[in-house]
Design a protein with these regions (language model features):
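Nucleotide-activated sugar donor-binding and catalytic core shared by glycosyltransferases
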Residues: 1-293
Length: 293
């Protein structure tokens, strides 16, 4: 069998696989409204492609509706497979950083995009009135933007330090920029209040489950269309909060600072949902393949 994942659908490959009578399965299918409009523009071609799927596992109800309209026949709404991911142990933060963080009130802005860092800078200035030892950690989505981020934050009158293992971090640092890839989990393990970027700008948001599994309380903007059902679950369990302004973000962060991190009960709930989705997926794939062979 051939498996296509998420929204990675390759028409030529699908047509060739069908000629060879190889079963085609869509796993964790996700069709956004934007991509549905694109597929719908070539309606006859789209139906020819989606009709070839022997089985489609949808990650949400919206995708079920779109898949039907695009010509897919057997569709199962099992939920988002991202619930089933497990987190490896995070790298440890260097001792000098750990020591520095211990004397600070720390929060983190992760996977930030253009303009979102400025919002975090304004939030920092507001919170600094209440927490004089505040430190804001920014992990940009694209680290090549670090110099321009630093410049913009300096214009707000903030003292910025970029990650450098050799140099000492000045005690009056306001913003610490992580300008290296693969370090996010280390900071989730340490910061329990996290803003996830790509959600103020119209990008569709970032997957929040990783942060939730590390026990973080999550802030996000209004644009989270890529992970709608996950954020609904997190909002219902009081793990995440939507923000629309620096003032609103500051208020919620004050609440987060006074609360405990996400409970083990909620983490277990996330894992149980993931296991159920995996079990249904395995069962249905095995049934299909038995019938096809």
């Amino acid at each position: 069998a051939a498996f296509f994942i998420d929204s990675e659908i390759w028409p030529n490959m699908i047509l060739n696989l069908k000629k060879k009578k190889i079963p085609i399965i869509l796993i964790n299918g996700r069709i956004t409204h934007k991509s549905f409009i694109r597929w719908k523009f070539f309606e006859n071609f789209s139906k020819k492609i989606f009709d070839n799927f022997n089985l489609c596992f949808s990650s949400n109800k919206e995708t079920v509706n779109f898949l039907k309209k695009l010509g897919a026949k057997k569709i199962l709404n099992v939920g988002n497979l991202k619930f089933s991911q497990t987190e490896k142990k995070s790298e440890k933060i260097q001792e000098n950083l750990k020591k520095f963080f211990k004397s600070k009130k720390v929060w983190c802005a992760s996977s930030t995009h253009f303009n979102e860092e400025n919002l975090c800078g304004l939030v920092h200035k507001e919170l600094k009135k209440k927490y004089t030892n505040l430190l804001t950690i920014i992990i940009p989505r694209h680290i090549n933007r670090t110099p321009s981020i630093k410049k913009d934050l300096n214009k707000l009158g903030l003292k910025v330090h970029t990650q450098d293992l050799k140099s000492k971090i000045p005690d009056d640092t306001d913003i610490y920029i992580v300008n290296a890839y693969g370090k996010t989990k280390s900071f989730y393990n340490y910061c329990k209040s996290v803003f996830l970027g790509g959600s103020i700008i119209n990008h569709g948001g970032q997957n929040p489950l990783e942060a939730a599994r590390f026990g973080c309380k999550i802030l996000h903007g209004p644009n989270v269309s890529n992970f709608k059902e996950i954020y609904t679950f997190l909002n219902q369990n009081k793990i995440s909060s939507k923000i629309t302004s620096p003032k609103m973000m500051s208020k919620i962060l004050v609440k987060f600072f006074s609360k405990k991190s996400v409970s083990n009960k909620v983490k277990k709930k996330i894992n149980n949902i993931g296991q159920k989705i995996l079990n249904v997926t395995y069962k249905e794939v095995n049934l299909l393949l038995k019938n096809e062979i």
